[in-house]
Amino acid sequence: MTAAIYLVKGREKSVKRKHPWIFSRGISKVEGEPALGETVDVFTHDGKWLAKAAYSPASQIRARIWSFEKEEINKAFFVKRFNNAQLLREDIIERDGLTGYRLIAAESDGMPGVTIDRYQNFFVCQLLSAGAEYNKQAIVDALVECFPDCNVYERSDVAVRKKEGLKETTGVLHGEEPPKSVVIEENGVKISVDIVGGHKTGFYLDQRDSRQQAMKYVKDKEVLNCFSYTGGFGLYALKGGAKRVINADVSQPALDTAKFNAELNEFDISKKRAVFLNADVFKLLREYRDQGTKFDVVIMDPPKFAESKAQLNGACRGYKDINMLAMQILNPGGTLLTYSCSGLMDQVLFQKIIADAAVDANRQVKFVERFEQAADHPTDTAYPEGFYLKGFACKVL
């Protein structure tokens, strides 16, 4: 008999609106002894069936809903999810010429705690919830059925697993170990991805649309690409006809890959055209400001500054300082392309931070375009938390 949870009276409202999370304070009773990640039936306080969910006794999010239908959570269930997700993305894949894309965007694709990115025939999984871990083999078996030639690699080396009572883990789940370099293509740009050692699952696929949109601002411009990682924005800037691109990052291996990516695309990377600079971006911006060095375009794509609500105030200060510095080194009429991937910081707050940075920089700034995560990272209407990446193009006068 399947274990069950019963909700506190009134707490069924969010479930009826199809939100996939049930918090510990919303549960009045647990029937049976569900294991970590085991599937449970969800009932209202008076016994009306609501959903199938994964139980996570160690987490404040005590249950994550797999389905609002009375169906088994097994290989066949995941096959259906994968087929639906692939179908949703077919137009995007064809339009942008993608060999790297997000197949599963967790809750937004009906798979709580499961992220799967595809790089050629390597499918990289992050399993961040107890339910995902419990169903790991069924998830892998379903991937193999849907994509028979696939290799599956796990990158669950993420601290959030501890909140679910899980250890961090990585490794081959099916097929071959990924090579050091897997080359993908997007919008005609080739990019080398290090699946095993790179950030996240290897690359920032969510910024693909923003990279493409950035091209219209860079022709014949001096561009500073901050937190460049393996050069994604820098590659598009070179493709867009930038006069010169400085890629700045604290990681030398990432910069080496950025240079390799530029060569892979046969871009001119003479020192007059492309620079790969190992530097702390905060210090570098202050040095440029103090030296009077100016740019026409500054691209500001920092790592996530806020992992929790307790870190949000500090993150706000960090975003304000770094954008203020960027504004101070822009030529009059220059463009600031700035982004935040912190889900806790909504677009309204981020816009206010940019406005505060403009005051501190003593520059007049106009918002001219807004950006968000790429189209293969959808946001379900019932799960607004799925919208996390936001950005602005700003004209700095």
From Swiss-Prot:
One of its Pfam families is: Methyltrans_SAM
Instruction: List the PROSITE patterns.
Output: PUA
Gene Ontology molecular function, alphabetical: RNA binding; rRNA (cytosine) methyltransferase activity
* SMART domains xref list: PUA
Q: Which top EC class applies here?
A: transferase
* Cellular component aspect of the GO annotation: cytoplasm
Record-given protein name? Ribosomal RNA large subunit methyltransferase I
